């Protein structure tokens, strides 16, 4: 029983430090913004960079952040979580690199931040299981 109580006390102390850890991640302590997820699965036609950019005036009064899908090239129409290039090709199923930059710029002018959805351990290959394209980092 004594061991159980010590374990519970340790957990309670750890939980007590969670608010301190959460506030140390760069967010203002009284942040009141709301984030919009600007995509859903297989939404590459509905959530093109140009379509999201055209909605900036409608979004600005209500949202401080827009979460957008990843922007790397994946070799075809997909959500892009099998991307081939992380650093050298930003032409994705959602539009071109220039359209992405334009959307981010417009959002910034309207006071909207942009957060990219990136799954760093997902990567597609060119031909087979281990044939990753080379990139310059």
Locate predicted features.
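Bacterial N-terminal signal peptides that target proteins for export
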Residues: 1-9
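Sec/Tat signal peptide C-region and signal peptidase I cleavage site
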Residues: 18-24
């Amino acid at each position: 029983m004594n061991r159980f109580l010590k374990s519970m006390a340790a957990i309670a102390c750890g939980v007590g430090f969670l608010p301190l850890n959460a506030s140390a991640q760069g967010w203002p302590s009284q942040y009141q913004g709301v984030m919009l997820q600007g995509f859903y699965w297989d939404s590459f036609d509905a959530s093109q960079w140009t379509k999201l950019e055209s909605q900036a005036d409608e979004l600005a009064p209500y949202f401080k952040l827009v979460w957008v899908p990843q922007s790397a090239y994946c070799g075809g129409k997909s959500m892009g979580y099998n991307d081939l290039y992380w650093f050298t090709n930003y032409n994705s199923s959602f539009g071109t690199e220039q359209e992405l930059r334009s959307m981010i710029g417009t959002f910034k002018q309207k006071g909207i931040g942009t957060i990219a959805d990136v799954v760093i351990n997902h990567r597609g290959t060119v031909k087979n299981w281990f044939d990753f394209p080379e990139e310059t980092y």
